[in-house]
Amino acid sequence: MSSLSGKVQTVLGLVEPSQLGRTLTHEHLTMTFDSFYCPPPPCHEVTSKEPIMMKNLFWIQKNPYSHRENLQLNQEVGAIREELLYFKAKGGGALVENTTTGLSRDVHTLKWLAEQTGVHIIAGAGFYVDATHSAATRAMSVEQLTDVLINEILHGADGTSIKCGVIGEIGCSWPLTDSERKILEATAHAQAQLGCPVIIHPGRNPGAPFQIIRILQEAGADISKTVMSHLDRTIFDKKELLEFAQLGCYLEYDLFGTELLNYQLSPDIDMPDDNKRIRRVHFLVDEGYEDRILMAHDIHTKHRLMKYGGHGYSHILTNIVPKMLLRGLTERVLDKILIENPKQWLTFK
């Protein structure tokens, strides 16, 4: 679209790409995660229902999806405002808010947060995984889904005039469902018409990212403007990672700060820690993919906020970047990952 071409679309309107600065490409500021509540371990039911307190924070850190209050990030708008001001003070400029239909997207709150903090916020269009799809969503054709995505970018989301600036995160399960496949095809069709950025949440299997890219390609997507999220919990084998990198999408390591003994959403996966993430990013840089890497935290629960002793949205800037420099990555490369790559991805063609 000519009016969008060369611009980035935030919840406050179009901006020049050069205005973004350091950008986190996969975060949540207001959402609910009730659909993914996990029953607590035996004899821990009482703790799971307590308010979040200092004495149970350690338990919540180990069982984040078994505490119902922890899944209500939408209750912390004031704390999020303070976090974004801190993020800006530490050198942050922009943030992509990946909450889509099914996770209680709230574009009014996103607009308020952008106005209050001066942080550029880009909202996400589309649908999360099948478990959150309504009967109406499942009944839609690819053409109808395409129209929904285009409308959320050109006219506004959720009955408002507040426009999304990316499609995604588009949720995919493993195995992929029929409804998710239709939405992927609609995503490709909408992207082909709009020239917009796309971001994908893959299923928790090493084959999922490959399958998703293939479906998008066959439906006409621009893979060079597509992000594959959560690679830190999805592709572990280096050879397999390089095979995937050759497909040309952005490679996102977006779980910085998440260091779990037990990954409740997929217990067979051993979640890497931040040192392993840093080594994996370094590996991709050494292999020539510095222009394809993106980083974020994917905060979506209360316990990861600074208010509750968590790392917050400034963790990458205050802790990860210094460690990366210590490990031999250069300022130039880190500026590429945090400034240039997000800018290139978020700019409409």
From Swiss-Prot:
Disruption phenotype: Mice show reduced food intake, resistance to diet-induced obesity and improved glucose homeostasis in response to stimuli that increase taurine levels. Complete loss of tissue N-acetyltaurine hydrolysis activity and a significant increase in N-acetyltaurine levels. It is an enzyme of class 3 (hydrolase). Changing residue 300 to A: Abolished N-acetyltaurine hydrolase activity. Its EC number is 3.1.-.-. Expressed in the kidney, liver and brainstem. Changing residue 233 to A: Abolished N-acetyltaurine hydrolase activity. Its main location: cytoplasm. Its cofactor is a divalent metal cation. It catalyses: N-acetyltaurine + H2O = taurine + acetate; N-propanoyltaurine + H2O = propanoate + taurine; N-acetyl-L-methionine + H2O = L-methionine + acetate; N-acetyl-L-isoleucine + H2O = L-isoleucine + acetate. InterPro entries: AryldialkylPase_Zn-BS (IPR017947), Metal_Hydrolase (IPR032466), Phosphotriesterase (IPR001559). Keywords: Cytoplasm, Hydrolase, Metal-binding. It is found in: Cytoplasm, Cytosol. Changing residue 169 to A: Decreased N-acetyltaurine hydrolase activity. PANTHER family: PHOSPHOTRIESTERASE-RELATED, PHOSPHOTRIESTERASE-RELATED PROTEIN. Belongs to the metallo-dependent hydrolases superfamily. Phosphotriesterase family. N-acetyltaurine hydrolase that regulates feeding by catalyzing the hydrolysis of N-acetyltaurine into taurine and acetate. N-acetyltaurine has anorexigenic and anti-obesity effects that are dependent on GFRAL receptor and GDF15. PTER also acts on other N-acetyl amino acids (Met, Ile, Leu, Val) and N-propionyltaurine, but at lower rates. This is N-acetyltaurine hydrolase.
